[in-house]
């Protein structure tokens, strides 16, 4: 697939493919966009618009780094290309962001594809942390806890966050030999602020309260062996009228990496059911 680079304000991204328009929203938060392979997988289904979110190189952008600001950026990208409505295809934190768009701006969406997303329930974090505890050494776990404490205190550095991803990265894959490279840049302030915004919305139960009113098609695709527990996705999907869930076997947090074609196949079957 041939992609073309674009700049929309401070955001740097790429567009390509053919079909219905779709925003591709990466996870992290505050890491460079890594969804090129997913865009390639979906190139015959969607015209994709993917970009690195604000506050992280190669994109710029000043604060605020909140869920609201990231939603506004997504709509700005659509506006820049004259797209009235699009699919929101998000992975991990990006899937969570897509669900917020569904609640706050359904008039700008055609539907949502949430790939191994952070769901609506804060309790999933405890199980995710427990899974990492089993997979990492005590020293690695202690270092992750130390860095996370510094992030919560607003004192973390980019180098520490890059180290954090390097330690935790193998746990995102069922087969570590298939792991893609971890991020080498993290927007430190963006990471701090997005996580604070996440906590605020979890406490306000934004998605739990808003998703039952959704009236657009929503597909969840989740790795069977992901560090994010499958129940987080199935229970989040249970809040959305008519939502469908596909669990990808022998896959961790990146289904399109460990089981190439799995996300495309799920989307194609889902679209066929809408016709």
Language model segments and positions:
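Conserved alpha/beta-hydrolase "acid-adjacent" motif
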Residues: 227-232
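Conserved hydrolase catalytic core segment
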Residues: 84-128
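Conserved HGGG/HGGXW glycine-rich cap/lid loop of the alpha/beta-hydrolase fold
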Residues: 9-60, 77
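Short beta-strand/loop motif that positions the catalytic acidic residue
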Residues: 214, 220-222
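Catalytic active-site module of serine/aspartate enzymes centered on a nucleophile-bearing elbow/loop
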Residues: 243-275
